[in-house]
Each structure stands twice: as C-alpha cells, then as structure tokens.
C-alpha cells in the first residue's frame, strides 16, 4: 500500500489530497479563488500567489484530517512544480519541501499536465494503456500518446490560444461573468448551435495542431457588426461559438485516434468539464467500433491535487525523487 500526499497550486486553486495506491482518494480538498478573481474578469497572478500563502497549510491540515492518515502513514509528498504561474507554483513547492523535510518523507515533483492525463485513473473504471490523451484547459490544448505512467509523446498542440482561453476571452467579449467557459456552457444549453456559422478552428493539413485565434477574431467581428445580443439570441451565439470549439477538439482527437490506431481516448483538463464536449466525444466514440472514451468526473477535470498524487505515486514507484533544490518551472514541457 502506497499513500501519497500531494499539493497543487499551479494557478488559482489551492488543493491537497491523500491518495492510496494511485487509485483511491482518501481525501481531496480544493480551495477555489473564483470569487477573488471574478471582479477582475480573470486570474490575477499576484492575488493568486498571496491567497495560496494563506490557504495552503489549512488545506493540507484538512486533507490529512479527512483522510484519517497522519504523516507517519504517508510514503511521500508530491507537488506540482510546473507548468503554471511561477509565484503560485512556488508556494506549493516550498510548502511541500518543508513538509517532506519535517516528516522525513521522499519528495516528488510532478508535471501538472501529467496530472491531468492520469486523472482518469481515479474514476471507477480507469483506462488501460496505451491511450490518446487530449488535455484541454485555459493554458493548454494538447494531444498526447500515453504509453505508460511517465511515458508520453506530444502529438499536437495549439499554435496560439488554448481552447479554454478562447472560451474565457469569448465570454469577456460577450460581457459574461468569470469563469467564462462555465457561463458560455450554461447559456449554450438554451441555444441553437447551428444559428451562426463560425470558421473551423482547425489547422489545415495533416498535422494534429489546433488554432483558435481565428475563431476568437470571428466572434469579435460578429459583435462589432451586430452588437452583443440578449435573451435567446445570446444563447444562440454562445451555442454556435461553443460548437465551433468543440467540433475542432473532437475532429482532431478522433483523426489522431484513427491515424495512430488508438482504441482509447482520455479527455482531461478544465475544458473537459464542458457538457457539450463530453457529449460530443461520447457520441463520436459510439460511431467507431472498438473505440472507448474516458472522461473523469467534472471535479477531477478541474485542477485538483488527487491527480497530482496519482502521477506522484507512479513516479515514486519508478524511483524518482526530488532534492531540496526542487524549484518551480513555469514552462515545464511534458
């Protein structure tokens, strides 16, 4: 039995979890900063860092209390050390280093994107390797071939804006509240996704990259020409814009799956909480014999520490250890 306590502070959630054997979350505590950043319409890095300083130890204490496991029952401390906001990452890294030293436990640094890729192993039915992983968040839109824990190959990524960024910036153009992706998803449920024709957010050619800047620009031109609508017309606009983003994600993911002969697709990252993306990916998988799609519960799509504990557990089992010189790497590539 391997029990790992993990800390996640890469952006605006302060999170801590205790996970057993990389499969069972004994606790999973998340302190969100949505209310703090809402007035600014997005995450303010300095405010995020300051709030992490205040919240990190109370969140750790709560995670330990909920798990029923004390420091003596832990095998290691894992922490997100990149990528992310450097100030936010530093808070988590310093806390994890202090705890590992105080408790005499091994320390493991974890890539935040790997955490998303393995979050599905906390679900009731986990995927098997190999699988195609689509990580979609506010800062990342990437396709990975996952051949085993710690064994990933980047297949494609966004050339400009991430899908989550396209949602958030689109919502800001429409005067919707933060977080924008959630607001668009909610309104889109009442709208017609075919009401407005947006350009395909797909890079032409055989590669597996994405591009969302043109779609965002198309929304800007639409708003400049027609203004921001209200009522049903706003719902139609949200549904159409969302559909263009979702269509690009699903088409590229399944193109990669067919070309590279993957039978399993894992959706991960905050945008994987989008209801239309979840439905579209599930429906597309049903069209292909032998194709399965794995989507973690919504709470495991958004930033959390349980997924970091999963990745940290397997890094520990591979013999990986971080020393006292572990530092934040805001641009760490997986």
Swiss-Prot record:
PANTHER family in UniProt: TRNA N6-ADENOSINE THREONYLCARBAMOYLTRANSFERASE, TRNA N6-ADENOSINE THREONYLCARBAMOYLTRANSFERASE, MITOCHONDRIAL
Transmembrane parts of this sequence: none
CDD domains: ASKHA_NBD_TsaD_bac
Subcellular location(s) of the protein: Cytoplasm
NCBIfam families: gcp_kae1 (TIGR00329), T6A_TsaD_YgjD (TIGR03723)
Molecular function (Gene Ontology), one example: N(6)-L-threonylcarbamoyladenine synthase activity
Cofactor remark: Binds 1 Fe(2+) ion per subunit.
Co-factor requirement: Fe(2+)
Binding site for Fe cation: 112, 116, 303
SS bond partners: none
Keywords: Acyltransferase, Cytoplasm, Iron, Metal-binding, Transferase, tRNA processing
InterPro entries membership: ATPase_NBD (IPR043129), Gcp-like_dom (IPR000905), KAE1/TsaD (IPR017861), Peptidase_M22_CS (IPR017860), TsaD (IPR022450)
Function field: Required for the formation of a threonylcarbamoyl group on adenosine at position 37 (t(6)A37) in tRNAs that read codons beginning with adenine. Is involved in the transfer of the threonylcarbamoyl moiety of threonylcarbamoyl-AMP (TC-AMP) to the N6 group of A37, together with TsaE and TsaB. TsaD likely plays a direct catalytic role in this reaction.
Record bears the keyword Protein transport: no
Cellular component per GO, a single term: cytoplasm
Protein name: tRNA N6-adenosine threonylcarbamoyltransferase
Binding site for substrate: 135-139, 168, 181, 185, 274
Family according to the record: Belongs to the KAE1 / TsaD family.
Any GO BP annotation: tRNA threonylcarbamoyladenosine modification
Reactions the enzyme catalyzes: L-threonylcarbamoyladenylate + adenosine(37) in tRNA = N(6)-L-threonylcarbamoyladenosine(37) in tRNA + AMP + H(+)
UniProt signal peptide: none
Enzyme Commission number(s) of this protein: 2.3.1.234
UniProt cross-references to SUPFAM superfamilies, sorted A to Z: Actin-like ATPase domain
